[in-house]
C-alpha cells in the first residue's frame, strides 16, 4: 500500500536549508495545481520567512491562480508577465553584477533557452537582465533568501554559479572557501571520514587553481589535463 506521512508539511521542512523548485509552469516538476493547497504554499512561505533558502529555476511555483503566475512571486521577488499586468509600472532593471552569486562569472551567464517576460518586483536585486527580461535575481523574504534563475544548462561555470546561489540562499557565504577550488574547472572532493581528499581537473587542458581546505588554509596547484591528485587530511 501507499505510505503516507503523518508529519505536518512544516515539520518536513525543518531539516532543510534550501528548497529548489525547477521546471515549467503547470508541470509535475514545479507543482502545478498543488500550489492551490494553502497548507503547501504557506508552509514554504513560512520556511523562507523564518530563514530558509529557496531557489527557483524556469517557472518556479508556476500555476495561474488568484492573480499570479508564480505562486511564490512575493518570495522570489519576480513574476511572469501574463497580460494582466501590462499596465503596471516596471522600473526595477538595474543589474547588480558584483553580487556574491556572480563573483566567479568570468563570462556572460548561459541561461540556455531561459524564460521570457519575467520582471522584478520592488525590492528585488536584479543580477542579470537581457532586453528588460530578468534572467537572475536575488530577494530577501523575512529572514530568508530566494534566488530566481531562468535556466541552468549544465556547465562547470553554471555549476559554480548554482553552488554560490545555494550558499547565499542558506546564509552560508562564509563556507565558500571550504574544500573549494578558485578555478571552477577544478573540483575538490573531501572524504572526511576516510581522512582523504582529492583535487580533480575536469578538463582536457592543464589548469591552475588555488585549493582551499579548512580553517582558511589554501595552496596553489597546477594540474595536467584530467589529472587527479590525492591528499591526506
Question: Residue spans of the language-model regions?
Answer:
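Short catalytic/ligand-binding loop motif for oxyanion handling, primarily in non-cytosolic enzymes
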Residues: 28-29, 62-67, 137, 156-158
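Loop/turn elements at helix/coil->beta-strand transitions in domains of secreted/extracellular proteins
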Residues: 14-18, 50-54, 144
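The substrate-binding groove and active-site-proximal loops of carbohydrate-active enzymes
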Residues: 21-37, 152
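Extracellular ligand-binding/catalytic regions of CAZymes and related secreted enzymes
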Residues: 11-12, 23, 71-86, 120-125, ...
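A glycine-rich, often tryptophan-bearing local segment used as a flexible ligand/cofactor-contacting loop or short
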Residues: 31-107, 112-114, 127-128
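Short amphipathic alpha-helix with an adjacent loop that forms part of the alpha/beta core around
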Residues: 8-14, 36
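Short, small-residue-biased leader/transition segments that mark boundaries at the very start
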Residues: 1-7
Amino acid at each position: 500500500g501507499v505510505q503516507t506521512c503523518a508529519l505536518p508539511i512544516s515539520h518536513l521542512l525543518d531539516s532543510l536549508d534550501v528548497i529548489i523548485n525547477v521546471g515549467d509552469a503547470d508541470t509535475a516538476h514545479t507543482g502545478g495545481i498543488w500550489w492551490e493547497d494553502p497548507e503547501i504554499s504557506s508552509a514554504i512561505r513560512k520556511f523562507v520567512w523564518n530563514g530558509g533558502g529557496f531557489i527557483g529555476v524556469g517557472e518556479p511555483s508556476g500555476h495561474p491562480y488568484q492573480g499570479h503566475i508564480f505562486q511564490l512571486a512575493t518570495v522570489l521577488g519576480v513574476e511572469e508577465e501574463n497580460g494582466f499586468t501590462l499596465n503596471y509600472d516596471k522600473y526595477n532593471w538595474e543589474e547588480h553584477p558584483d553580487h556574491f552569486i556572480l563573483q566567479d562569472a568570468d563570462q556572460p551567464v548561459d541561461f540556455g533557452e531561459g524564460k521570457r517576460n519575467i520582471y522584478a518586483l520592488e525590492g528585488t536585486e536584479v543580477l542579470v537582465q537581457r532586453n528588460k527580461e530578468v534572467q537572475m535575481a536575488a530577494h530577501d523574504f523575512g529572514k530568508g533568501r530566494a534566488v530566481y534563475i531562468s535556466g541552468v544548462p549544465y556547465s562547470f561555470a553554471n555549476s559554480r554559479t548554482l553552488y554560490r546561489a545555494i550558499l547565499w540562499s542558506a546564509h552560508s557565504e562564509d563556507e565558500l572557501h571550504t574544500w573549494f577550488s578558485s578555478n571552477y574547472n577544478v573540483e575538490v572532493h573531501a572524504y572526511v571520514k576516510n581522512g582523504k581528499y582529492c583535487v580533480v581537473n575536469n578538463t582536457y587542458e592543464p589548469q591552475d587553481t588555488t585549493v582551499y581546505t579548512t580553517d582558511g588554509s589554501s595552496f596553489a596547484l597546477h594540474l595536467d589535463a584530467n589529472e587527479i591528485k590525492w591528499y591526506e587530511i
